[in-house]
């Protein structure tokens, strides 16, 4: 079985792929890929940036050596309610594309909706999304991965670790994302360097993200061992 694990950023996958084989990719592609064989299964983890276009590139890269039998869309997500806690990992039962209205049902017993948007959601937008969709989490990639899985007729599973709470007051990241879904780090750091009101929240975001990536890795490992063949 070939299992694709699609994320946006290397940091989301770092604890999971420790010890995996790094797969060479075209220079300048913006894609990072790792591979591992386990119990007769081939696992391939890929990230290519934030947003739907980057998720599609990552999915295509995962298929380069052969078609996938199942796919996982994983990574960090923002909280839309206080019911999901930063640093914890959750399995979505439904993915909603806020742009198209499409809904993708997933095989999870606990009801938990995730909504995918085209931009990073700020505090105000988070509350609107929670009210409009009854969702608990927001990301930028899951719907694109779910759509590609549906087209191919393969199962999709969604695991997201919460990086920021519903009330987190973070700087607007959207102006600092390039066309490939990568953060323009130098420009972003220059922006926040003179805005100390964001320093505490960004520090908390970093801690939540690091802890969440570890929890995400443990959740994925457990799923691959116990949940995949149920």
Question: What do these predicted ranges mean?
Answer:
Residues 20-23, 62:
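Alpha-helix boundary/capping residues
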Residues 2-21:
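N-terminal beta1-alpha1 ligand-phosphate binding loop
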């Amino acid at each position: 079985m070939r299992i694709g694990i699609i994320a946006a950023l290397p940091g989301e996958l770092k604890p999971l792929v420790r010890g995996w084989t790094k797969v060479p990719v075209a220079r300048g592609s913006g894609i990072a890929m790792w591979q591992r064989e386990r119990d007769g299964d081939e696992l391939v983890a890929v990230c290519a940036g934030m947003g739907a276009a980057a998720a599609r590139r990552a999915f295509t890269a995962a298929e380069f050596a052969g078609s996938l039998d199942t796919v996982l869309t994983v990574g960090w997500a923002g909280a839309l309610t206080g019911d999901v806690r930063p640093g914890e990992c959750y399995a979505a039962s439904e993915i909603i594309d806020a742009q198209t209205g499409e809904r993708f049902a997933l095989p999870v017993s606990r009801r938990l909706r995730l909504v995918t948007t085209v931009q990073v959601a700020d505090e105000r937008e988070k509350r609107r999304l929670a009210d409009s969709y009854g969702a608990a989490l927001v990301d930028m990639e899951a719907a694109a991965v779910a759509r590609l899985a549906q087209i191919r007729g393969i199962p999709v599973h969604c695991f997201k670790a919460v990086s920021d709470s519903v009330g987190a007051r973070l700087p607007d990241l959207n102006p600092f994302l390039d066309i490939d879904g990568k953060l323009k780090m130098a420009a972003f750091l220059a922006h926040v360097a003179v805005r100390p009101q964001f320093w505490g929240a960004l520090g908390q975001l970093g801690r939540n993200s690091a802890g969440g990536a570890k929890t995400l890795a443990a959740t994925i490992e457990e799923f691959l061992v116990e949940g995949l063949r149920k």
